Design a protein with these regions (language model features):
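Pyridoxal 5′-phosphate
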Residues: 1-230
Length: 230
């Protein structure tokens, strides 16, 4: 409720704040703000870098949060959860590691016109480095993902697919299970940008059949500067 968010009690230009920009970044509830304050005030130290009490406490909290994310996504192991600085960093990590290592000149990546820039720019950089080709899937006349166009776009040269779970502009939600099943049936890995979708839809990464999945904390009522890559 509104009372859980301290910032929503302030006035701007004589009116109580009504915040409608959650697709860009969400406000923080008191529980999150107090959790940050508690940690920074009492337990903060370097993680995995010391044997003293504060370092042990910080490391324990760090790894416990990884297990919480594992449970949230229904991952098989907490080792499958990678902390990043956000959604953009997660895409860049996949592009500069897996894709950079496994794609060659002339290979194709498929992305959609619904993507956030964070799921576009890294693939342009990869194109400059490796000479790959980018194929675009347009929305249909209703602003929805065109699965028929997507299926026709896949060729023997298609080596990677990156698609949003939910458009931050249109709110359209492609059927990611269909996309993954179709792609994996032809041996093509998939990255799902879940920054918008994870807020609204329950995710079971085991059902996604080993697809890359990512999201950020600041759109999920969490702190800035934290992201997840599965």
């Amino acid at each position: 409720s509104r009372k859980d968010f301290p910032i929503l009690s302030r006035e701007i230009q004589g009116n109580i704040l009504t915040y409608l920009d959650n697709a860009a970044s969400s406000q923080k509830p008191m529980e999150v703000l107090e959790g940050i304050k508690q940690f920074e005030s009492n337990d903060y130290s370097n993680v995995h870098r010391g044997l003293h009490t504060l370092s042990v406490l910080s490391t324990s909290a760090y790894e416990e949060s990884r297990k919480i994310v594992q449970k949230f996504l229904n991952a098989k192991s907490s080792d499958e959860i990678i902390f990043t600085s956000g959604g953009t960093d997660s895409v860049n990590l996949v592009a500069s590691s897996y894709a950079d290592e496994n794609l060659s000149q002339g290979d194709e990546i498929i992305i959609t016109t619904m993507e956030h820039h964070a799921n576009i720019v890294p693939w342009h950089f990869l194109r400059e480095r490796k000479g790959i080709q980018i194929k675009w899937i347009d929305c249909d006349q209703n602003g929805k993902f065109d699965i028929n166009q997507f299926e026709k776009a896949i060729t023997s040269k298609t080596k990677f697919i990156a698609v949003t779970q939910m458009s931050n502009v249109l709110g359209a939600s492609p059927n990611i299970k269909n996309i993954i099943d179709l792609s994996h049936s032809q041996g093509i890995p998939v990255l799902i940008d879940g920054c918008q979708g994870v807020v609204h839809e329950k995710i079971d990464v085991q059902e996604l059949d080993r697809a890359f999945y990512l999201f950020s904390g600041h759109k999920l009522y969490g702190p800035n500067g934290i992201g997840i890559l599965y």
